[in-house]
From Swiss-Prot:
GO biological process terms on file: ribosomal small subunit assembly; translation
A cellular-component GO term for this protein: cytoplasm
Pfam families reported in the protein's UniProt record: Ribosomal_S19
InterPro entries per the UniProt record, alphabetical: Ribosomal_uS19, Ribosomal_uS19_bac-type, Ribosomal_uS19_CS, Ribosomal_uS19_SF
Name assigned to this protein: Small ribosomal subunit protein uS19
Family: Belongs to the universal ribosomal protein uS19 family.
A GO term, aspect molecular function: structural constituent of ribosome
Keywords annotated in UniProt: Ribonucleoprotein, Ribosomal protein, RNA-binding, rRNA-binding
Length: 94
């Protein structure tokens, strides 16, 4: 379910403040955040934000297409190791 329109999009205040400071000073550095639920705003375009995935911070470069989505959508929380290959045991059961 999406957030109510009357409430507006959520963003962590500290994160928005740091982005606005960096835009004002013309800086480009990686910002660490644990706020996966923050919405990507147009002010963030061109910045790299390291989003926490539960173990480490994964750098995400923000582009125009990401505006309106949540930061957590761009970082996987589970390691996909692929499916098992066919083993002798599985082929024997047939």
């Amino acid at each position: 379910m999406s957030r109510s329109v009357k409430k507006g999009p959520y963003i962590q205040e500290v994160l928005l403040k740091r982005i606005n400071e960096m835009n004002k000073n013309g800086e480009k550095k990686v910002l660490k955040t644990w706020s996966r639920s923050s919405t990507v705003f147009p002010q963030m375009i061109g910045h790299t934000i390291a989003v926490h995935d539960g173990r480490k911070h994964v750098p995400v470069y923000i582009t125009e297409d990401m505006v309106g989505h949540k930061l957590g959508e761009f970082v996987l929380t589970r390691t996909y190791r692929g499916h098992d290959d066919k083993s002798e045991k599985s082929s024997r059961l047939r």
